[in-house]
């Protein structure tokens, strides 16, 4: 964990981190596949008949130049605790790759270090498409497209606490927002800013008016939809003495369901269209794939039984729990049963310069134990508990319908 923390890398470019993880897993005698969605690493253990449990760790760091451990070149830092996830996944592999353990289990386990959980902005996406990434929004989405989860039956994920939690562990998946994004280009008309500004169409004024309209729309958002709107102006004219004829904005709509995301995106689009009409400009937009909302899942019995074996406090997810943030784990929850827990052991803010691991046992060791114990309980006794979870789970999408949804809504070209 400390080595990975000292060498942070951005999404889809985690080459050093991936090589480090692959070497460790090979050292355990596992069959390792690398270069998945550029940098993903998957190691297989047992490979026998029965359910597959896929344990996930995320490779990438977050852009945070102000963090004291930020890379001076790429500007990223492990201020979201992904290095702790990798440590937990590796620790679980150490515990499970034991002949005596294997003899008592049915099924298989995959240890999957995945790239690019953090949001990839529009400019980088264009480059990634040229590099052959079909769904460049996130690593998990691209890995679904590539079929790298085709053999998975149950997914185990973990993260540092993403909500205020006093206990050591939070078991289950709290519902989370999903989001969609757009790259909006506002076309106006250039004119001299002093001599004849009335002959111009100010693209920045169109943008400002649209954003003000969105502010006035907030009373139309239902509380249960947890809507959040974001606009970042990437460009607003070229010179100070000319009416801006072009503005470029990257937008994001967060909400708690796919329907709410779609409805709110339409409102945002109408704001830009209406402002452009009022000033005599035009709008061009490029829909960008986001993340799907996380579907709530309570604490599974196997996980709660496992955490009781640790010297740790915990609480279980409740249907009313909600996290306004987004993660591409949401996409997985629409296809697979995802058993999740979060953990403490850190201080400071997620994605902040003050994020710091304070309790290494709680942040690195105990999560590894909980992953291993949960996996063991899923696959022991002829994998009875794993089979029950798979039998009861009702997916929203399969791989084909998921990929078609992305193509239909976000124009992602493969």
Mark where each language-model region is.
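Acidic/His- and Gly-rich active-site-bordering loop/insert found
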Residues: 1-79, 83-110
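Histidine/acidic-residue-rich, glycine-tolerant segments that coordinate divalent metal ions
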Residues: 42, 67-77, 83, 99-230, ...
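Divalent metal-coordination and catalytic microenvironments
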Residues: 4, 43, 55, 82, ...
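Non-cysteine beta-strand/loop elements that form the S-adenosyl-L-methionine
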Residues: 54-56, 65, 182-187, 339-344
């Amino acid at each position: 964990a400390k080595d990975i923390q000292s060498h942070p890398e951005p999404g889809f470019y985690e080459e050093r981190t991936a090589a480090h993880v692959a070497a460790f897993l090979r050292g355990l005698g596992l069959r390792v596949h690398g270069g998945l969605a550029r940098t993903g690493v998957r190691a297989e253990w047992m490979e026998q008949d029965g359910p597959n449990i896929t344990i996930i760790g995320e490779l990438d760091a977050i852009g945070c130049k102000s963090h004291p451990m930020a890379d001076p070149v790429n500007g990223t830092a492990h201020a979201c605790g992904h290095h702790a996830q990798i440590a937990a996944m590796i620790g679980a592999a150490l515990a499970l790759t034991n002949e005596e353990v294997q003899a008592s289990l049915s099924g298989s386990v995959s240890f999957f270090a995945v790239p690019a959980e953090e949001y990839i902005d529009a400019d980088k996406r264009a480059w990634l498409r040229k590099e052959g990434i079909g769904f460049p929004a996130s690593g998990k989405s691209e890995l679904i497209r590539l079929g790298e989860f085709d053999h998975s039956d149950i997914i185990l994920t973990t993260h540092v606490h993403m909500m205020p939690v006093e206990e050591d562990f939070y078991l289950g998946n709290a519902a989370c927002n999903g989001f969609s994004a757009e790259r909006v280009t506002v076309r106006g008309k250039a004119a001299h800013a002093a001599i004849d500004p009335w002959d111009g169409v100010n693209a920045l004024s169109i943008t400002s008016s649209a954003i003000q309209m969105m502010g006035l729309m907030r009373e139309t958002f239902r509380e249960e939809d947890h809507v959040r709107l974001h606009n970042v102006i990437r460009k607003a004219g070229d010179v100070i003495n000319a009416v801006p004829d072009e503005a470029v904005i990257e937008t994001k709509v967060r909400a708690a369901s796919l329907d709410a995301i779609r409805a709110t995106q339409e409102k945002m689009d109408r704001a830009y269209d209406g402002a452009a009409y009022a000033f005599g400009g035009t709008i061009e937009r490029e829909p960008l794939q986001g993340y799907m909302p996380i579907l709530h899942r309570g604490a599974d019995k196997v996980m709660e039984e496992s955490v009781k074996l640790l010297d740790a406090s915990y609480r279980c997810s409740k249907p009313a729990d909600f996290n306004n943030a987004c993660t591409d784990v949401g996409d997985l929850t629409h296809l697979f049963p995802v058993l999740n827990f979060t953990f403490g052991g850190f201080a400071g803010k997620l994605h902040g310069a003050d994020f710091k691991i304070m309790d290494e046992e709680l942040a690195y060791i105990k999560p590894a134990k909980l992953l291993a114990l949960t996996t063991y309980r899923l696959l022991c006794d002829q994998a009875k508990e794993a089979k029950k979870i798979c039998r009861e789970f009702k997916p929203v999408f399969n791989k084909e319908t998921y990929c078609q949804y992305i193509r239909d809504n976000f124009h992602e070209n493969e």
